[in-house]
Structures are given as structure tokens and as C-alpha cells.
């Protein structure tokens, strides 16, 4: 299927990398983003990287909760499918500000689904998260593993998964794929697009890169008393380009008339500790990272990594990059863009 694709949150980290892959694949791509946690600079760079395909990109600054504005976007283009990345994603912030997360993530998604249905667009790829597995009793996590929202953020992902299942059950014309991805890291090999979180980062690798370029004094290691090989948490880190490719495979799978509502893990199937990841980044950058060991964060699980067999079998997708390539590309992005998409610490 090559057609018109709407990408919500397309100016963000994962969204921008996926938009580039869509353009290179020949898709006409429309991005909507409220730019609360992202920058239009990323979209301009995507356009540049896409070369001649960049002319097939349109951008609207729209909040998904603004139904009239969303209706206008849908009235201008007949979409074949939607990729839904938009949403807030910081576990710690969600614990402190649960209503912000429920309002932003749930209402936005419900509004999107309503407008899609009204315009006869019933194909959706939804960005879920491995956070729905909570603190798993067994690893690797399969798509059938027990689910548990350990934070308001995690619960929004769980709720949206249930909403998607209910929507498809109520109207079998819907085809929905929900992608539970693990820990996205790295950047496009060009060094032109990457992760640029607003404020102090919540995730490991953007935090690491801000320490290395001198924007933060040290890296806080949250929890060093886990029952893992070095006491730090274990995660399944996946290169953002692999993740973007997984979304393209999911989009193509929506051509399957029998898909219904399906869920797939996107990860490498390998667990890496926080300290192992820090060591790999030090090797890639040639820099020493000052560490400060602090207590565990509420809502953080000990060990989480994916079983990827279902995605390999049904989506014909497999992660290609290891942590060395992830850190190499992350450092390439960080060293070329020490202030992200801005030109100074205070610019956006």
C-alpha cells in the first residue's frame, strides 16, 4: 500500500524518523503535531534528507484535542491510514501530573478515532509501549504476558490498547496494529535528526548525551541494588531506525484484510544494563561520563526485554543494529547538535 498517510506527533523523535522512512518509501505524508515537545526543525531536516521525496510532505500545527482543526485536516486529504505517535511519555512526570497525561493521551486518541471513523479512515498503527508489561515476573515479554500499568503513563497506553480493541470489535472494518516498543535510542546515521527532549531528559541516552556535551554535570543512575549482573536495571534498547522500519512493516501488514486488531513487540530480544549502555557510549564517544548513584525511581521495573518472534514471523521485521551502532549514531547526533535542534541551551 502506497498512499496518503497521516502521522500524529510526526515532529517528535520516533515520529520524525518514521516520516523519513515513509517519504523514502514513496508515501505522501501529512504530519500533525502540537509542537509542545518537538520542533519544526526536525521536519525541515527530514524534508532535506528525503531529497526529491520531500515534496510529498505536508505539516499542520494541530493539537489532536482540537476536533474542528483535526476535521479540517481530514477534509483536505483522504487518508489511507494513520500512524499515531502523539502523546506525553515521561513516567515520572505522569506520576506527578496524572490528569495532564489522562487528558493529553486519552482524549487526544478518542478524538482522533472519532474523526477517522467519520471520514472512513479505519486503518491505524498505534504507538504503545513495553511499559504495559509493568514489572514482568518472567522475561522475555511476549505479547501474551500479563499487563500492568505501573504509572499513569503506562495506564494511558493500556487504556488506549483496550479502546482500540473495543473499536475494532464494534466495527470489524477497522484494522489496527498496536506496537509495543521497548527503549528507543540512537539517531539517524546522518546525524541530522535525533532525540531532543525539552528540559531535563527522562530517558537514559538523551541524559547521557547531555552530560557528554556539557549541558548536565553528571548522570544519575536510578537504582544500583537490583538483582542484575551489576545492580542496575536491564532494558531492551532498540535503534530508532529499526523502530521506524518496524512501523513501515506494520503499515504494510494493514493490507491484510484479516488483521483485525493485533499487537506486536518491537525490540531486539536482548537485555542490557544501564552501566553496560553507559560503557558502550563512553567507547563510542571517547569520553568519560561522571556518575552519581541515587535511589530507584517509583514505577521503574528491574528487567524488561522483548520476545520478538511474533514480529519476525508476521511482520517480516527484525532489528538490525546492536548497542555499538546505537551509541555511535547517538554520539554522532549529539556531537553535531550539542543543543539539539536549537543553537543554544535556551533555544528551541
Swiss-Prot record:
<dbReference type="Pfam" id="PF16363">
    <property type="entry name" value="GDP_Man_Dehyd"/>
</dbReference>
<feature type="binding site">
    <location>
        <position position="181"/>
    </location>
    <ligand>
        <name>NAD(+)</name>
    </ligand>
</feature>
<comment type="subunit">
    <text>Homodimer. Heterodimer.</text>
</comment>
<feature type="binding site">
    <location>
        <begin position="297"/>
        <end position="300"/>
    </location>
    <ligand>
        <name>substrate</name>
    </ligand>
</feature>
<feature type="binding site">
    <location>
        <position position="85"/>
    </location>
    <ligand>
        <name>NAD(+)</name>
    </ligand>
</feature>
<dbReference type="InterPro" id="IPR036291">
    <property type="entry name" value="NAD(P)-bd_dom_sf"/>
</dbReference>
<dbReference type="GO" id="GO:0003978">
    <property type="term" value="F:UDP-glucose 4-epimerase activity"/>
</dbReference>
<feature type="binding site">
    <location>
        <begin position="202"/>
        <end position="204"/>
    </location>
    <ligand>
        <name>substrate</name>
    </ligand>
</feature>
<feature type="binding site">
    <location>
        <begin position="220"/>
        <end position="222"/>
    </location>
    <ligand>
        <name>substrate</name>
    </ligand>
</feature>
<comment type="similarity">
    <text>Belongs to the NAD(P)-dependent epimerase/dehydratase family.</text>
</comment>
<feature type="binding site">
    <location>
        <begin position="12"/>
        <end position="14"/>
    </location>
    <ligand>
        <name>NAD(+)</name>
    </ligand>
</feature>
<keyword id="KW-0119">Carbohydrate metabolism</keyword>
<feature type="binding site">
    <location>
        <position position="89"/>
    </location>
    <ligand>
        <name>NAD(+)</name>
    </ligand>
</feature>
<dbReference type="GO" id="GO:0009832">
    <property type="term" value="P:plant-type cell wall biogenesis"/>
</dbReference>
<feature type="binding site">
    <location>
        <position position="235"/>
    </location>
    <ligand>
        <name>substrate</name>
    </ligand>
</feature>
<comment type="function">
    <text>Catalyzes the interconversion between UDP-glucose and UDP-galactose. Involved in channeling UDP-D-galactose (UDP-D-Gal) into cell wall polymers. Required for the galactosylation of xyloglucan (XyG) and type II arabinogalactan (AGII). Cooperates with UGE2 in cell wall carbohydrate biosynthesis and growth.</text>
</comment>
<feature type="binding site">
    <location>
        <position position="157"/>
    </location>
    <ligand>
        <name>NAD(+)</name>
    </ligand>
</feature>
<dbReference type="GO" id="GO:0071555">
    <property type="term" value="P:cell wall organization"/>
</dbReference>
<dbReference type="GO" id="GO:0006012">
    <property type="term" value="P:galactose metabolic process"/>
</dbReference>
<dbReference type="InterPro" id="IPR016040">
    <property type="entry name" value="NAD(P)-bd_dom"/>
</dbReference>
<keyword id="KW-0520">NAD</keyword>
<feature type="active site" description="Proton acceptor">
    <location>
        <position position="153"/>
    </location>
</feature>
<protein>
    <recommendedName>
        <fullName>UDP-glucose 4-epimerase 4</fullName>
        <ecNumber>5.1.3.2</ecNumber>
    </recommendedName>
</protein>
<dbReference type="GO" id="GO:0005795">
    <property type="term" value="C:Golgi stack"/>
</dbReference>
<dbReference type="GO" id="GO:0046983">
    <property type="term" value="F:protein dimerization activity"/>
</dbReference>
<keyword id="KW-0413">Isomerase</keyword>
<feature type="binding site">
    <location>
        <begin position="33"/>
        <end position="37"/>
    </location>
    <ligand>
        <name>NAD(+)</name>
    </ligand>
</feature>
<dbReference type="GO" id="GO:0010053">
    <property type="term" value="P:root epidermal cell differentiation"/>
</dbReference>
<dbReference type="InterPro" id="IPR005886">
    <property type="entry name" value="UDP_G4E"/>
</dbReference>
<keyword id="KW-0333">Golgi apparatus</keyword>
<feature type="binding site">
    <location>
        <begin position="63"/>
        <end position="64"/>
    </location>
    <ligand>
        <name>NAD(+)</name>
    </ligand>
</feature>
<keyword id="KW-0963">Cytoplasm</keyword>
<dbReference type="GO" id="GO:0009969">
    <property type="term" value="P:xyloglucan biosynthetic process"/>
</dbReference>
<keyword id="KW-0961">Cell wall biogenesis/degradation</keyword>
<feature type="binding site">
    <location>
        <begin position="181"/>
        <end position="183"/>
    </location>
    <ligand>
        <name>substrate</name>
    </ligand>
</feature>
<keyword id="KW-0299">Galactose metabolism</keyword>
<comment type="pathway">
    <text>Carbohydrate metabolism; galactose metabolism.</text>
</comment>
<dbReference type="GO" id="GO:0042546">
    <property type="term" value="P:cell wall biogenesis"/>
</dbReference>
<feature type="binding site">
    <location>
        <begin position="129"/>
        <end position="131"/>
    </location>
    <ligand>
        <name>substrate</name>
    </ligand>
</feature>
